[in-house]
Structure formats: C-alpha cells, structure tokens
C-alpha cells in the first residue's frame, strides 16, 4: 500500500523533471529502476548523505508509525511498481524495510533482477535471527559507503 516515505533531500528540486531527459543514461540494465553513479540531480551534500545513508534516517519515523519495518525489501516508487512483472510484485507482499538483504550485499551495485531474487529469498526464509544478522551487516555497509549512490 502506498505511504509517505520520509528522506532528507539529496537532490535538486527539479530532479523529477530532469529524470525524463536522463533516462537514456540509466545504468540499471533492466530499466525498472533508475540508477546513475554520477547522477547530476544529486547535490554535493546529497552525495555525502547518500554515501553514509544519512538520508534514510527519517524513515525511522515510518517504522514508528507502522508503515515500514527495520528489515524488509526496500519500498519502491509507484513508477517502478507500474513496470513490475507479477514475479517482481512478490516483494510487495511484506512490509518494506529501511535495510534489506541486498543493501548489505552490495547496495546499488546489485542489478534489479538480483535485488528481486534476494528479496524473494528473504521473504521465504525471514526470521528474527536473519533480521538481526542483516541489521548487524548494515553497520559496516553504511560505514564503508560501498555501492551507495
């Protein structure tokens, strides 16, 4: 179900309008998600807060109000869901999380199809211990900033 997703602003105000002109430069091979390592819409300060996931901190409010959990598949944009296959939609069957298995396995360096596969595997085998393991692995993933853009 859709909900208001809180983040600190890391992009210029006209980022969504500029996205259309940048679609040709999408580095995501499958086109469902939009990723660019050197996205010109991201501010200098935005690069810093994204690298260390500081922009994600407001999502703790989403957890408190029950829209999200600490661990679970990352919430997609409605425009991304519109391009999902039935198989991709399986990742929408659980509450989204601030961190997830592919966040601790390479973050944005992981292609979308692999993200979906990892999310589905997580959904099938989730447990308190697995969530604790993912939370522990999140700390070094955030501190190194590897794969964050």
Residue ranges and their predicted role:
Residues 1-149:
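Conserved small/aromatic sequence motifs within transmembrane helices
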């Amino acid at each position: 179900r859709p909900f208001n997703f809180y983040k600190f602003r890391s992009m210029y105000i006209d980022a969504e309008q500029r996205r259309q002109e940048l679609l040709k430069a999408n580095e995501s091979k499958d086109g469902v998600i939009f990723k660019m390592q050197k996205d010109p819409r991201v501010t200098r300060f935005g690069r810093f807060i994204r690298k260390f996931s500081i922009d994600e901190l407001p999502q703790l409010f989403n957890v408190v109000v029950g829209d999200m959990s600490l661990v679970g598949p990352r919430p997609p944009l409605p425009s991304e869901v519109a391009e999902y296959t039935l198989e991709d939609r399986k990742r929408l069957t659980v509450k989204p999380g601030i961190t997830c298995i592919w966040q601790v396995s390479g973050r944005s360096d992981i292609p979308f199809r692999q993200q979906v596969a990892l999310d589905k595997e997580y959904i099938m085998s989730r447990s308190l211990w697995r969530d604790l393991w993912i939370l522990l692995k999140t700390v070094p993933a955030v501190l190194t900033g590897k794969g964050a853009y």
